[in-house]
From Swiss-Prot:
Subunit structure: Component of the outer core of AMPAR complex. AMPAR complex consists of an inner core made of 4 pore-forming GluA/GRIA proteins (GRIA1, GRIA2, GRIA3 and GRIA4) and 4 major auxiliary subunits arranged in a twofold symmetry. One of the two pairs of distinct binding sites is occupied either by CNIH2, CNIH3 or CACNG2, CACNG3. The other harbors CACNG2, CACNG3, CACNG4, CACNG8 or GSG1L. This inner core of AMPAR complex is complemented by outer core constituents binding directly to the GluA/GRIA proteins at sites distinct from the interaction sites of the inner core constituents.
The protein's name: Neuritin
Native source species: Mus musculus (Mouse)
Family assignment from sequence similarity: Belongs to the neuritin family.
Prodomain positions: 117-142
Any single biological process term in GO: presynaptic modulation of chemical synaptic transmission
PANTHER family per UniProt: NEURITIN (PTHR15902:SF1), NEURITIN-RELATED (PTHR15902)
Amino acid sequence: MGLKLNGRYISLILAVQIAYLVQAVRAAGKCDAVFKGFSDCLLKLGDSMANYPQGLDDKTNIKTVCTYWEDFHSCTVTALTDCQEGAKDMWDKLRKESKNLNIQGSLFELCGSSNGAAGSLLPALSVLLVSLSAALATWFSF
């Protein structure tokens, strides 16, 4: 049985992880463009979710959301590639730690299996939107 957290705690966890990543990259000093790259990744994910097609069947809904999620992670890794080696490693570590939180309805759970349950789509979307809001609030505070 996994840990069950509400949206507020999930947002806090994601915000802390992103703040930790930003601080690690900021400390490196040679990654001036990484902040722009990372914010572009967040904005692209937000735009994708905002322009989410309506009226799709459940299987297509899950596939579409998971594609956005994987694109976000690929974009982030690409943005961090030009930084010192520690930033990309830190992102990969945060991604693995987030996956291990085992939060019911998370995108890691939804997109981690090829047969994700359609019923968990709405909680996952709300978790994503709350998490993005927290991430953007944290991002703008720096």
